[in-house]
């Protein structure tokens, strides 16, 4: 039996060799040079045609799009909440007030992020009346000023360390931009620590108000210079608490059409993050 | 081992030589098997020294410890029964159900999917260890894969079991009774309880309950056709006449039938049981059959080949991209998940179940046409059959003697030999016929069993031997009520046929009341009858029998004999009234009446005629490129005559012997190439080397093997298989069963077939009609073509399923389609359409092309794979991507922004991912969009699979020629695709685990232009194939 197998192995080896190059018929991998030429030419033409066709259909499809507004916005009916700066992994801020290198990254991110919000940057923007939606007809859409001082202690103006050096870090909470979203009521962001004995939260602007004048958003292309309204949450650990670790939950409140509860989407209208302040 | 002889299997005395040869060949093949066989043979050999036929009654009594008059004692019988087991054949070993089930669980692609499932679980395990909150996705996937394997396995098992069950009910044997003498008493016991040494009584019509040494019998005849293929009854008596136990007259064999035992008054033959159960000749042949390995069916080989191709592609692409993924710095776990996804995308999970359904649909269709298929895979085998080795008796012939020719008035008349026999159109006006018909009716001892008036004549049961039965039925058809004629012509004396006289005689009063003469009628061997005659009747008048008349008689006799027919001569004589007055007392012992100088009336010849449908079926097989070979145990002359009459040897072809005779030269001088036909006897065959047999099989298109033993049938089948032919064997007798088993497809006869034959066969012709085989061939070829279409259809979408993963890995697009979604295509939308292709009608006349070459015309060939994967598959992938890009673009993510977005897109912590319009998306919102993308991609594939389904209806003809609406099931399939997709999207869109969303109505139509393009492209392909057959295009594009 082994003998037979050996033989067939040798045979198959010879067959393979002949398959790779057959000297009698000049076939290489089962085809002659001419045949290979033909088949390659065929595929060149065929795939060239398919590529052209695909490009064309894609082009046709792109023609159906509008540069300013996406055709459908039904998949994002309600905005998510997100915090800033973005920790490296998960939503956990770990820092030590006594070690500036532990929070330098956060501060730099915040500064960079807040750059468009500085007063010089916004001077071309409109001062809009508070409390009402600034609906516009175009063709030119103006953006409303978001004076950075609204963020008070977290504005970086009085405290360039955004509270990190004092052990009371600032985290910015922002609502995702959605084109055409018109919040109803008086939307505000409410942040609550999980354990009130450990820390308390101050929100700026006061009460975490998000002014309606920043809505609706008209899209990146039309709404040049648009500034997203921000809410800053400053975590102030209780002096008597030894534990310097708290989970903070922020959610949109006060607006009936902005959802803050969804079983599947943990970030729809709410966000939870954790602050760990090491000694 | 070389010396071992198994002559018992052989009809010929010396057939053992070929058995030796066979053993020698087999021995080289497989050492293990040889060892096993050796033991088996050793055991057989001991019992093969059957010498009971040589022993005297006394010796037998001592040998078996029994008493011929009193029989065995019940206690002794019970002892022997316990010792030797019941007198029944051990049924062939059944594979345990659980093994069958497990085979389904691991066969085909299942192993691959099991590996995938296990990898999934392992991947989750590793993830879980590092992060207990890891997502359960891979657990779901693994479970789903396992469930898919188990479900398809259960399904395939159920299908198999269903077709096997039909067989089980079919093969139940009727319990048999035997009359046995035990404790000096006659008892009726089940034949199963017979033991060696039992004294049994046999009546005419009984099945012989075991191998029996006859002790006393008169005029006993047995039908050995199921054992040797001889259609003529063999007479049996208590004398030892031959060395060979098969030839000697004093042994009868298990499962043969006793036709007639003893003269009147109804008596019985007695005999002693010498072998029971598996130790009988039949039992040994049956065990020989079960020793023959079961070959894999051609379709099983094809499916295996196909599974290898697809699994090869799946695994190599999977591993290639695993390596690429690792090189691209993907996490190894992620790379494993990709690997699984690629395998899942490549494996057509539903296909094997679909193939099973398609085969069982064909099996059902064939069962309706009286072809019962035992093994589902055998459905296709007939389609690829290139050689049919057919038994003669009972398969090609009706297995009953029938009057074929008559000779009277110096003229040969042809009688109708068709199954109903009603159309006897020869000239019946001559006075000679009147006399002849009277002799036929009167000089005959056969009788119809009473109470059969309503049964058609040819179907009535007759008591009597085959020739007499034929004559009785013949005269009943022509003359009407023969019993009545016999009553009117009262029989006064008779001498039954015996082998020394070779004639049968009876004397009757005539029905004419004015004619007081007695009529003496006689029939027998023609030369004997002629000797006794001095006159001959021509046109109703007696003439002296001169030399020229005698010459004419001989010519006619030779001619009829040359047709392989059994010829009988008939004569009569009116006894003069003065010498033999009414009161004359005839005596059969002293024969006090003249038996010479009679008047010769005519000859009549009989044959077991071919079934009327056979010639047509043989012609059809021929035009389908199938070689029909006759293999029979019967005599060469008869075999050749039947072969000629059914067209196995066509009218204008000659054998070497024919040419020699025609040209008047010696057989050796004939150029063998001139002969198209060959008649080979078992004796010649046993002297042939395998090479000579190969040469014979290769060079002669028309071959008849005669006087072959069961062993030789096997050798012939093996010889055919060496020619790379797919061999079908048809047969009904026990002697056929080894060959039936060895053949690629064994076809047994349902009505006349023995249980052994049915057990060994893969297919059963319920109506015993050879022409059903043609139906089988047609259906088999059709299903092969249609399976090609089904597979092509199913493979196509694999590319569309695979590309998303490749592009996801390489270009980092958000995943276009999920693994579970893929399974919904493979096992949801595509199932019914791929079954629907099994209903497709043939494109052209499939019975006019050659059978496929086992090694060249594969089910899945390169062209099919290339065309499905690289042409249609790729077009489908593009179409599906178009839908996918459309969905993303219209929601805000333009195609260009999607590239290399994967890491951000898949990050759970990134909940403000910005799209091209400045909007921000949370992780879940993106996820939901991704599912919408899955659904869109799914719908894209589904829509194009509709086009794929339509184009796969034909491989060469235009769809419009085939008819869009002829196969309604295709439309059921299309409807099912759409309905399943709608249900998934709109009905189950809210179930998260399934990853489907409600897709906007317009997205269902995005891929339609691509679908139309696929159709147009394929029509173009077919057009060029039709326009330029044999061209480069044809070679590369026709699958």
From Swiss-Prot, chain A:
Keywords: Cell membrane, Disulfide bond, Glycoprotein, Ion transport, Membrane, Potassium, Potassium transport, Signal-anchor, Sodium, Sodium transport, Sodium/potassium transport, Transmembrane, Transmembrane helix, Transport. One of its GO terms (cellular component) is sodium:potassium-exchanging ATPase complex. Glycans are attached at residues 124, 240. This is the non-catalytic component of the active enzyme, which catalyzes the hydrolysis of ATP coupled with the exchange of Na(+) and K(+) ions across the plasma membrane. The exact function of the beta-3 subunit is not known. The sodium/potassium-transporting ATPase is composed of a catalytic alpha subunit, an auxiliary non-catalytic beta subunit and an additional regulatory subunit. Interacts with catalytic alpha subunit ATP12A. The C-terminal lobe folds into an immunoglobulin-like domain and may mediate cell adhesion properties. This is Sodium/potassium-transporting ATPase subunit beta-3. The lineage of its organism: Eukaryota, Metazoa, Chordata, Craniata, Vertebrata.
């Amino acid at each position: 039996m082994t003998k037979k197998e050996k033989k067939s192995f040798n045979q198959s080896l010879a067959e393979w060799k002949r398959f790779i190059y057959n000297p009698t018929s000049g076939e290489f991998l089962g085809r002659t040079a001419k045949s290979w030429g033909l088949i390659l030419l065929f595929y060149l033409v065929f795939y060239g045609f398919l590529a052209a066709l695909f490009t064309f259909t894609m082009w046709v499809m792109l023609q159906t799009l509008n540069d300013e507004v996406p055709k459908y916005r039904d998949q994002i009916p309600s905005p998510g909440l997100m915090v800033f700066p973005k920790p490296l992994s998960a939503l956990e801020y770990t820092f030590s007030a006594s070690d500036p290198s532990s929070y330098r990254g956060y501060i730099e991110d915040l500064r960079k992020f807040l750059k468009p919000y500085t007063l010089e940057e916004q001077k071309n923007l409109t001062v809009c009346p508070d409390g009402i939606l600034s609906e516009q007809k175009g063709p030119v859409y103006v953006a409303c000023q978001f004076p950075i001082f609204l963020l008070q202690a977290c504005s970086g103006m009085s405290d360039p360390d955004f509270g990190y050096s004092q052990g009371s870090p600032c985290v910015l909470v922002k609502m995702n931009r959605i084109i055409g979203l018109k919040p109803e009521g008086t939307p505000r962001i409410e942040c609550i620590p999980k354990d009130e004995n450990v820390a308390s939260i101050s929100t700026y602007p006061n009460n975490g108000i998000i002014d309606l004048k920043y809505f609706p958003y008209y899209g990146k292309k039309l709404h040049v210079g648009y500034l997203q309204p921000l809410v800053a949450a400053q975590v102030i650990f209780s002096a008597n608490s030894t534990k310097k670790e708290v989970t903070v939950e922020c959610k949109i409140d006060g607006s009936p059409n902005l959802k803050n509860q969804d079983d599947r989407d943990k970030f729809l209208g709410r966000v939870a993050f954790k602050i760990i302040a090491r000694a | 081992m070389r010396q071992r002889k198994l002559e018992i299997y052989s009809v010929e005395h010396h057939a053992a030589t070929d058995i030796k040869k066979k053993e020698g060949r087999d021995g080289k093949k497989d050492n293990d098997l040889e060892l096993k066989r050796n033991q088996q043979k050793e055991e057989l050999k001991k019992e093969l020294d059957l010498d009971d036929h040589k022993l005297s009654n006394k010796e037998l009594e001592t040998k078996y410890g029994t008493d011929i008059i009193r029989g065995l004692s019940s206690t002794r019988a019970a002892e022997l029964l316990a010792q030797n087991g019941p007198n029944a054949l051990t049924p062939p070993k059944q594979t345990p159900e659980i093994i069958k089930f497990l085979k389904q669980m691991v066969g085909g692609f299942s192993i691959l999917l099991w590996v995938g499932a296990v990898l999934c679980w392992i991947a989750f395990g590793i993830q879980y260890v590092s992060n207990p909150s890891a997502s359960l996705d891979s657990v779901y996937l693994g479970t789903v894969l396992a469930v898919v394997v188990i479900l398809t396995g259960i399904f395939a098992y159920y299908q198999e079991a269903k077709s096997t069950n039909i067989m089980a009910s079919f093969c139940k044997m009727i319990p048999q009774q035997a009359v046995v003498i035990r404790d000096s008493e006659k008892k009726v016991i089940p034949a199963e309880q017979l033991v060696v040494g039992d004294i049994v009584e046999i009546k005419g019509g009984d099945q012989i309950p075991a191998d029996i040494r006859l002790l006393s019998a008169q005029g006993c005849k047995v039908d050995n056709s199921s054992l040797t293929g001889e259609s003529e009854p063999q007479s049996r008596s208590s004398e030892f006449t031959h060395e060979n136990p098969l030839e000697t007259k004093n042994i009868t064999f298990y499962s043969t039938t006793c036709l007639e035992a003893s003269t009147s008054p109804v008596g019985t033959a007695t005999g002693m049981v010498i072998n029971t159960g598996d130790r009988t000749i039949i039992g040994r042949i049956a065990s020989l059959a079960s020793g023959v390995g079961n070959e894999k069916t051609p379709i099983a080989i094809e499916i295996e080949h196909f599974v290898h191709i697809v699994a090869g592609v799946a695994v190599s692409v999977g591993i290639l991209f695993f390596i690429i993924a690792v090189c691209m710095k993907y996490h190894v776990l992620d790379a494993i998940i990709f690997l699984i996804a690629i395998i899942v995308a490549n494996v057509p999970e539903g296909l094997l179940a679909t193939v099973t359904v398609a085969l069982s649909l064909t099996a059902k269709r064939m069962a309706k046409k009286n072809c019962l298929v035992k093994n589902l895979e055998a459905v296709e085998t007939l389609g690829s059959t290139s050689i049919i080795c057919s038994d003669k008796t009972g398969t090609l012939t009706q297995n009953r003697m029938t009057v074929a020719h008559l000779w009277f008035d110096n003229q040969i008349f042809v009688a109708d030999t068709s199954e109903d026999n009603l159309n006897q159109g020869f000239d019946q006006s001559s006075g000679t016929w009147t006399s002849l018909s009277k002799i036929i009716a009167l000089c005959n001892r056969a009788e119809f069993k009473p109470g059969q008036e309503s049964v058609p004549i040819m179907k009535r049961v007759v008591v009597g031997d085959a020739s007499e039965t034929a004559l009785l039925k013949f005269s009943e058809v022509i003359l009407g009520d023969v019993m009545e004629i016999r009553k009117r012509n009262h029989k006064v004396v008779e001498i039954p046929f015996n082998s020394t006289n070779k004639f049968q005689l009876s004397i009757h009063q005539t029905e004419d009341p004015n004619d007081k003469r007695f009529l003496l009628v006689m029939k027998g061997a023609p030369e004997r009858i002629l000797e006794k005659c001095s006159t001959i009747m021509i046109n109703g008048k007696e003439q002296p029998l001169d030399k020229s008349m005698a010459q004419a008689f001989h010519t006619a006799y030779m001619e009829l004999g040359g047709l392989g027919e059994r010829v009988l001569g008939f004569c009569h004589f009116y006894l003069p009234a003065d010498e033999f007055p009414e009161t004359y007392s005839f005596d059969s012992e002293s024969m006090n009446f003249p038996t010479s100088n009679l008047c010769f009336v005519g000859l009549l010849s009989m044959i077991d005629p071919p079934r009327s449908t056979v010639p047509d079926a043989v012609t059809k097989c021929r035009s389908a490129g199938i070689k029909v070979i006759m293999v029979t145990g019967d005599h060469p002359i008869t075999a050749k005559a039947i072969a000629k009459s059914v067209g196995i040897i066509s009218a204008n072809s000659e054998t070497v012997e024919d040419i020699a005779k025609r040209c008047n030269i010696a057989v050796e001088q004939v150029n063998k190439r001139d002969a198209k036909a060959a008649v080979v006897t078992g004796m010649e065959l046993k002297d042939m080397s395998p090479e000579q047999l190969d040469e014979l099989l290769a060079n002669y298109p028309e071959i008849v093997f005669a006087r072959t033993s069961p062993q030789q049938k096997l050798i012939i089948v093996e010889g055919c298989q060496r020619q790379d032919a797919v061999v079908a064997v048809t047969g009904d007798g026990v002697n056929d069963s080894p060959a039936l088993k060895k053949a690629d497809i064994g076809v047994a006869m349902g009505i006349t077939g023995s249980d052994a034959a049915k057990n060994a066969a893969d297919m059963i012709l319920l109506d015993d009609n050879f022409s059903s085989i043609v139906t089988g061939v047609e259906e088999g070829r059709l299903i092969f073509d249609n399976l090609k279409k089904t597979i092509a259809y199913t493979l196509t979408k694999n590319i569309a399923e695979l590309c998303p993963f490749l592009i996801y890995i390489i270009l980092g697009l958000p995943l276009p389609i999920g693994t579970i979604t893929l399974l919904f295509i493979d096992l949801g939308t595509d199932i019914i359409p791929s079954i629907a292709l099994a209903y497709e009608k043939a494109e052209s006349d499939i019975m006019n092309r050659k059978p496929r070459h086992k090694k060249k015309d594969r089910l899945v060939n390169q062209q099919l794979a290339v065309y499905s994967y690289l042409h249609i598959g790729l077009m489908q992938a593009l179409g599906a991507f178009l839908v996918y890009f459309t969905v993303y673009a219209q929601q805000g993510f333009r195609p260009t922004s999607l590239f290399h977005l994967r890491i951000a897109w898949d990050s759970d912590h990134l909940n403000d991912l910005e799209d091209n319009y400045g909007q921000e998306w949370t992780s879940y919102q993106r996820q939901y969009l991704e599912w919408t993308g899955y659904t869109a991609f799914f719908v894209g594939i589904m829509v194009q699979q509709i086009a794929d389904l339509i184009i796969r209806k034909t491989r060469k003809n235009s769809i419009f020629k085939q008819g869009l609406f002829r196969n309604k099931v295709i439309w059921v399939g299309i409807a099912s695709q759409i309905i399943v997709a709608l249900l998934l999207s709109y009905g189950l869109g809210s179930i998260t685990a399934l990853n489907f969303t409600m897709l906007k109505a317009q997205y269902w139509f995005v891929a339609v232009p691509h679908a139309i393009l696929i159709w147009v492209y394929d029509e173009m392909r077919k057009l060029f194939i039709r326009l330029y057959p044999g061209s480069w295009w044809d070679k590369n594009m026709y699958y």
